[in-house]
């Protein structure tokens, strides 16, 4: 087995190419969205998801095309709040994953749509000693991929329901 010192460049993984490709895909998706709004708080349980769902509903009432990314991967609730359960089967097409349609036609992508049941935990790693930095890195990567892989189409607003903690906003820029 080669050690880190034995590798030249990226060791053949093309990691730089993969990161560039994800960035281009993400920019392409977000270019079709007029306004992106992240709703966040330093503390959990303060009503971010409820406020996000209500803002989306008000915008949809005014005729705007609205989507929500539930970026609270460990406590997703947007699907439930807007009428989408765990039984929804997401459809993958050539242009990406089709988001679920909630009340008022609000497009939704949420981790709870990917889990078997509402109380299924998200397991980032099998290792009991995984550090918070490692888990945070996996979370931010998952959020970027959900944004990039979801076929949002043209939207007036994309609301991003952030997880608790103010340290996460830099991870999705």
Give the role of each language-model region.
Residues 36, 40, 62, 80-85, ...:
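Conserved, well-folded catalytic cores of nucleic-acid-processing
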Residues 17-23, 89-93, 140-143, 163-165:
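Short gly/ser/thr-rich secondary-structure transition/capping motifs
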Residues 1-46, 86-87:
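Extreme N-terminal, non-catalytic leader segments
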Residues 33, 44, 70, 78, ...:
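Residue-level signature of catalytic and energy-coupling elements of molecular machines
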Residues 35-73:
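Walker A/P-loop phosphate-binding motif and the immediately C-terminal alpha-helix
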Residues 65-66, 71-121:
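Phosphate-binding loop that captures ATP/GTP phosphates
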Residues 115-173:
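Phosphate-binding/switch loop-helix module in NTP-utilizing enzymes
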Residues 48-54, 75-79, 162-171:
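Short glycine/serine/threonine-rich phosphate/pyrophosphate-binding segments
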